[in-house]
Amino acid sequence: ADLGYGPATPAAPAAGYTPATPAAPAGADAAGKATTEEQKLIEKINAGFKAALAGAGVQPADKYRTFVATFGPASNKAFAEGLSGEPKGAAESSSKAALTSKLDAAYKLAYKTAEGATPEAKYDAYVATLSEALRIIAGTLEVHAVKPAAEEVKVIPAGELQVIEKVDAAFKVAATAANAAPANDKFTVFEAAFNDEIKASTGGAYESYKFIPALEAAVKQAYAATVATAPEVKYTVFETALKKAITAMSEAQKAAKPAAAATATATAAVGAATGAATAATGGYKV
């Protein structure tokens, strides 16, 4: 008989998979270790996954049972430790609940995918499905590395850069609203909240995210990424894709500010030098 369903537990893709080393997430300390409770939980689950994967080097027919037998207890322990502390406030409590819900959905989806498979294929189907879902969830916590901003966003006009911070804030508000909505309503709730927040933060100057071409393209790309996705993780895929795009835009903005300042300083210096040279030769300045 199959092992019964338990709390959310991550896994790995099938053959040939090598676990990626998590990058230092936003909010990590100097040593690159996670600092938020959610990031700490994901790190513990990743550690348990690696141990279970290493221990699954058995006959194909026994891989699934061996993996779950090792990973289940490690995962449950991580959850017990991660959720045992008293939340520091409503925000942290809500964040933990959202993460737990996503992990739970990921586990159920992987378990369902493996139903009916032959013993040899059961392990591959289970870990491949759950690994992809967990990769997406980890992405929302910025646990894994993302591409440099230059690779994500080629060029963002100066006018657009000025509002990226407001867009980022609007995204967070919309994501919070969507996380509290029923699964079938998450897309609608997110887009409505996203647009409302952008309109409010710009004093009504803009009605929606579509005033930024690069952002509109990112939203369309994020929606496209969900086409072949199971309903249980559909919104999570969208949220991750859009978050990645906005993060890249934000990083590009940070890089653009010092560059613009340096250019302005250089221009002023050249102007001053030119003026001084003109005056020295008895000429004039406009």
From Swiss-Prot:
Domain of life: Eukaryota
One of the Pfam families matching this protein, by short name: Pollen_allerg_2
Compartment(s) of residence: Secreted
The entry's keywords: Allergen, Secreted
Biased composition regions of type Low complexity, renumbered to the chain: 1-34
Keyword Secreted included in the entry's annotation: yes
Main location: secreted
A GO CC term assigned to this protein in UniProt: extracellular region
Keyword match Endoplasmic reticulum: no
Record protein name field: Pollen allergen Phl p 5a
Region described as Disordered: 1-35
Family: Belongs to the Poa p IX/Phl p VI allergen family.
